[in-house]
Amino acid sequence: MKQSVSAEQIELKSSLPGSKKVYVDGPREGMKVPMREIEQSDTNGVPNPPIRVYDTSGPYTDPEYKVELEKGLQAPRHSWILERGDVEAYEGREVKPEDDGVKVASKHTPVFPQMDRKPLRAKQGANVTQMHYARNGIITSEMEYVAIREGVEPEFVRKEIAEGRAILPANINHPEAEPMIIGRNFHVKVNANIGNSAVSSSIAEEVEKMTWATRWGADTIMDLSTGKNIHTTREWIIRNAPVPVGTVPIYQALEKVNGIAEDLTWEVYRDTLIEQAEQGVDYFTIHAGVLLRYIPITAKRTTGIVSRGGSIMAQWCLFHHKENFLYTHFEEICEIMKQYDVSFSLGDGLRPGSIADANDEAQFSELETLGELTKIAWKHDVQVMIEGPGHVPMHLIKENMEKELDICQGAPFYTLGPLTTDIAPGYDHITSAIGAAMIGWFGTAMLCYVTPKEHLGLPNKDDVREGVITYKIAAHAADLAKGHKTAHQRDDALSKARFEFRWRDQFNLSLDPERAMEYHDETLPAEGAKTAHFCSMCGPKFCSMRISHDIREYAKENDLETTEAIEKGMKEKAKEFKETGSHLYQ
């Protein structure tokens, strides 16, 4: 008997503290765009308005929603897709045991119950990409939805997609996903990588990681599974994912040939693309820029080729002494992509894996080829983003952004960090967030998170949380630096709450309310401490913000200007400081 994955097997939580799920009505009937509304307490009887923030958590944080993983999420986009009249349902390819990396299907594998659904594809001669619609002046329902999430006009969304500066990854076979956009003129997005390996993790664990990542703010997830049950794991994830799902198809193709890179063929790879497109994968990382002539250049590197996909294709090219079949068949790949609206994430197979290799000839040679491939994809109206490094010291980061915008004609940049130093295993979420904040400021559209386990092991759900929060910090810092019109509102609200000692509001407005309250309560756990005008750092006598309040009160009571009050107030505080023994902490 086939097993299943149930909600009881994984940890699903309701809304974050002090928050509730709200929905904004869209322009068409039934369109409801989710937001997270953070409540605030009053200040001396004066109301502080609730703060609405972008929400990626899907229905899992809606108390009215009953989670049934075996049924998958509701599919609001399904009717939008059918209404356009350019798709057809068909039988699809037969799912085989080889798709899960086995010769005989295991009775213990929890197969998703709805495997008999028919996939959709474009009708003969049709193109169903969001870029195709945008270039023909059509504002789709997906674009209207995105406009509400981003706080912009639908026409602006359409134009950014039409001109290739943004992508809206939305496979017609993933109608469960809530539409989102990736582009430098929108909020900086964060991707979280999940997926099993040959030695670790189960299907239930990966579904849990997906719901966990989106709860903390992941805008997309990539399933990078390389072990058994790749197809089945992906089916469970996609059917329950409220965000776009990306993959690296070469990983599964390699499993189909028993892990022997030289046995890969275009036919096996093509079959894998169609398999994943029928399931609903929204974007593919394709390492079509790893050309035969670039491989020898990497020989003088400190760390060679560090991309898994890049190394697989390099091994194939060298064994056969032929050009990369992903490059030679690129037009055919475009034909597949536009039948399902799968977006390209053109892989950086030659990205630097160490500071010593940053911005070298191999890296930028591949980037030139990615620019060439971008033009070909756009000729087919297929959406494209470009993957970037990697390991890059701070002073070399800006050059990466400038070259990508120039060579790839403004296509969205999607970077892994970059890591700004190589000496901190166990802390690479920090070394990379430094680079991520910088390159996000310079124009990168989406940041691929790095967890504390980078270079060390497969991340668990706690590592996923740490990685997502770290990268939400980097993305938000980049939004602030770019002057995004609404980015500062949450900062301003939290700063006001901090100055007014509204501790619960401080916790609730933060990116990780649970962690903030946990740290506060380690030293001041009493409920009364949630209203105290100090914390354990400075104590009640030397809290700078309490002193500032005292100065303002002094000015008010003595009818003084603030500057004069500060001078007089500071003299009094100096006297008080001396009288208490000149000790800073008490």
UniProtKB/Swiss-Prot annotation:
Keywords: 4Fe-4S, Iron, Iron-sulfur, Lyase, Metal-binding, S-adenosyl-L-methionine, Thiamine biosynthesis, Zinc. Its cofactor is [4Fe-4S] cluster. GO terms for molecular function: 4 iron, 4 sulfur cluster binding; carbon-carbon lyase activity; zinc ion binding. Residues 1-59 are annotated as: Disordered. The keyword Ion transport does not apply. One of its GO terms (biological process) is thiamine diphosphate biosynthetic process. Pathway: Cofactor biosynthesis; thiamine diphosphate biosynthesis. PANTHER family: PHOSPHOMETHYLPYRIMIDINE SYNTHASE, CHLOROPLASTIC, THIAMINE BIOSYNTHESIS PROTEIN THIC. Belongs to the ThiC family. This is Phosphomethylpyrimidine synthase. The gene is thiC.
